[in-house]
A protein has these predicted regions:
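Cytoplasmic helix-loop-helix junction between adjacent transmembrane helices
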Residues: 82-123
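C-terminal transmembrane helical hairpin of 12-TM major facilitator-type secondary transporters
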Residues: 250-294
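Symmetry-related core transmembrane helices of the 12-TM Major Facilitator Superfamily/SLC fold
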Residues: 144-161, 340-356
Length: 364
């Protein structure tokens, strides 16, 4: 609720503070780049030290409390620093959290388990933007919206501490330990990362989408977070569906998801309100598949002792290509929205081909 509520308005908030489209794309991409780079270190440390809970809790504190501080930002430079801090906090917690989730989901099916996690996550992701939309509707302003999000931030930390008390040793939840042959991470994992890289590079971050919708006056400002909430609703449902399908047909489900999500960019950037609404639903479907199945597949490729490291590598590669794609699409947008569409569609379709090949190798 906290950081998704904030992400629904950071694009237009930066615009109000005087940032250009290139700046919005660069800040969004840089936050992801630095954040995902930190995950490489965080994942390695979580495996070496076994301190999954302390690392996770530290990350959540940074991740959540950077958001209400945005209410005090008076320049786009300061806002950008806080946005990047929020991403770094998420980076610190994510590998350790995902490793703990991989243990907890081993009995129910990792696709379904990670899908359920993503769906529950989206309950807050829907509520957060809607709360911000209500604040804007009541003429509270962007700063007021950020300040109100302090409440769910505090509640989230409380719930996290309760979970730490109830389940102090997550590895004990593992039903069985996967066997990894040879040294290092398996070749299939690296091939899989190539497909992930194309998905990340071509997926337009919401701040740039919100910037486009606001700058072109396609929708009223209070509708921008509502569209994000709609996307998060589609995300939640898609996570459950694709997670369920992954446990039955494997990697092939990612090819299906990428093919579907490749259609969002033309609808969002080249149409009016109705097409943008449909495009945001498809955007949310793609995000749901990414946030559930992409992580579940890593757990099934990697042994228990290397899983934190593998998630760190996975997230770092994802972040590097997300940054490169976001920065490039921000610059492309300043020339033409059509260039953004062409780049996004092309990279998504390339990922389809790679995932089909990975799926074929996994079954032979």
């Amino acid at each position: 609720m906290t950081y998704e509520g904030a992400r629904s308005i950071t694009g237009p908030f930066l615009a109000v503070l005087g940032a250009s489209g290139a700046v919005v794309g660069f800040v969004a991409g840089l936050g992801e780049l630095l954040g995902y780079g930190v995950r490489l270190i965080s994942g390695y440390l979580s495996d070496r030290t076994g301190k999954y809970w302390p690392i996770t809790i530290l990350g959540y504190i940074l991740n959540l409390f950077a958001v209400p501080l945005l209410a005090l930002a008076g320049s786009w430079q300061l806002a950008a620093i806080l946005m990047i801090t929020e991403r770094i906090g998420k980076a610190i917690r994510t590998p350790a959290r995902d490793a703990m989730l991989s243990h907890a989901t081993s009995e129910v099916g990792r696709g379904w388990g990670f899908g359920l996690h993503e769906a529950m996550d989206q309950i807050g992701a829907i509520a957060g933007p809607l709360i911000v939309a209500l604040v804007l509707y009541l003429r509270g302003g962007y700063q007021t919206g950020f300040a109100v999000l302090l409440i769910p931030a505090l509640l989230a930390i409380i719930v996290l501490l309760v979970a730490r008390h109830l389940y102090p040793t997550p590895r004990e939840l593992e039903a069985s330990q996967a066997v990894l042959t040879g040294k290092g991470l398996p070749g299939t994992f690296w091939l899989y990362l190539a497909g992930v890289a194309f998905i990340a590079a071509g997926y337009v971050d919401y701040p740039l989408i919100a910037y486009h919708l606001g700058k072109g006056s396609l929708v009223a400002s209070n509708w921008i977070p509502v569209l994000y909430a709609v996307a998060m609703g589609a995300d939640a449902l898609a996570a459950l569906i694709f997670g369920y399908l992954y446990d039955r047909i494997g990697i092939y489900v990612l090819a299906i998801a990428a093919l579907v999500s490749s259609m969002f960019a033309p609808l969002v950037f080249l149409g009016g309100f109705a097409m943008a609404l449909v495009g945001m639903v498809i955007w949310g479907i793609g995000m749901g598949a990414q946030e559930s199945v992409l992580r579940a597949a890593v757990a099934n490729m990697i042994s228990i002792d290397r899983r934190g490291t593998a998630y760190g590598v996975f997230n770092t590669i994802y972040g590097i290509f997300w940054f490169a794609g976001s920065a490039l699409m921000g610059m492309l947008y300043d020339f033409s929205a059509g260039y953004v569409v062409a780049f996004s569609v092309a990279t998504q379709l390339l990922s389809v081909l790679i995932m089909l090949y990975v799926g074929k190798k996994a079954t032979t």
